[in-house]
Regions:
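Short, solvent-exposed micro-motifs at the edges of structured domains
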Residues: 1-240
C-alpha cells in the first residue's frame, strides 16, 4: 500500500471507494536537454572554453490524492487498526484546498472549515447516534467527501549539469577526461507530500472520534519533503 492508502473501505458501501488510484498523477511533464556549447577551435581559447556541455532535466507533475477522514470508529464496524474511520461532509461550494498554503503557518493545505460531521435529518433522526461533541449529528452516517477527493500539492524539480571534456590523445583518439558538476534540485524548491490519513501521520483527520474539530496538524502538509534539498556533486570520469 502507498502512504496515502486506506487499506480497507466499507464493504457495505463500495460506491464510496470509487475514485482515482492512490498513485494517480493526472498530469506529468518531463523535459530534458543536452547542449554542446560552441567554443574556439584552437589555441588557449579551445583549452579553456571548448568541450563544455550543459544539461538539464525539468519535471512537473500533479500531486497525489488523499482522503479527509473522521477519527475513531463512528460507524461502529469494530475493525482493528487503521480500518476504523468515518467520512465527513464537504460543504457545497466550498473549495477544500488552501491555495495560499505556502504563506500559512503550519503549511495548512486542507481547509478544515469546508467540512462538517454528518448531520441528522428529520427523516433519519431516529436512527442516528450523535457524536458526543456535536448535538444533532449522525455518527453512523457516511458523509459525501469521497476517497481521494483532495489532490496534494504539485511537484516541481529541476536538475542541472555541467560537463567539461578534456581530450587525452596519449591514450587514444577518442579518450578524454570529463569533469562533471551536477546540481540536483538546483532551485532548492521544496516539494511536500499531501496530508496523510494514516501511517502514523494523521494530517488528513478533520474531526476527532467525538466529532470535535481535530487540532494541529489537521490539514497540514507532510514532513519530511518528498524531494531532497539542493544537492551538488563533482566527479572526474575517464572515457576511452
Amino acid at each position: 500500500a502507498f502512504s496515502n492508502s486506506i487499506t480497507t473501505w466499507f464493504w457495505f458501501a463500495p460506491q464510496i471507494s470509487r475514485a482515482v488510484s492512490d498513485y494517480n498523477f493526472t498530469h506529468t511533464a518531463i523535459i530534458n536537454a543536452m547542449w554542446q556549447v560552441p567554443g574556439p577551435r584552437d589555441g588557449i581559447g579551445k583549452a579553456v572554453l571548448g568541450g563544455w556541455e550543459l544539461g538539464g532535466i525539468f519535471k512537473r507533475n500533479s500531486g497525489v490524492p488523499t482522503t479527509p477522514l473522521i477519527a475513531g470508529d463512528p460507524m461502529g464496524v469494530q475493525n482493528s487498526g487503521s480500518d476504523t474511520f468515518g467520512i465527513p461532509d464537504l460543504i457545497p461550494g466550498c473549495d477544500p484546498i488552501n491555495h495560499n498554503y505556502k504563506n500559512t503557518p503550519g503549511l495548512i493545505y486542507i481547509k478544515t472549515s469546508c467540512y462538517t460531521v454528518p448531520m441528522a435529518t428529520p427523516a433519519i433522526a431516529s436512527q442516528c447516534v450523535a457524536f458526543s461533541a456535536v448535538p444533532g449529528s449522525c455518527s453512523n452516517l457516511l458523509g459525501n467527501a469521497g476517497r481521494n477527493s483532495i489532490v496534494g500539492p504539485p511537484l516541481t524539480n529541476f536538475d542541472f549539469s555541467m560537463h567539461k571534456n578534456i581530450p587525452v590523445r596519449k591514450i587514444s583518439e577518442s579518450a578524454n577526461v570529463q569533469f562533471r558538476a551536477e546540481f540536483f534540485n538546483v532551485l532548492n524548491h521544496p516539494n511536500f507530500g499531501p496530508p496523510l490519513p494514516f501511517t502514523g501521520a494523521t494530517n488528513a483527520i478533520i474531526f476527532n472520534g467525538d466529532g470535535s474539530a481535530a487540532g494541529s496538524p489537521a490539514g497540514g502538509l507532510q514532513q519530511p519533503l518528498v524531494t531532497l534539498p539542493r544537492d551538488i556533486q563533482f566527479a572526474l570520469k575517464l572515457i576511452w
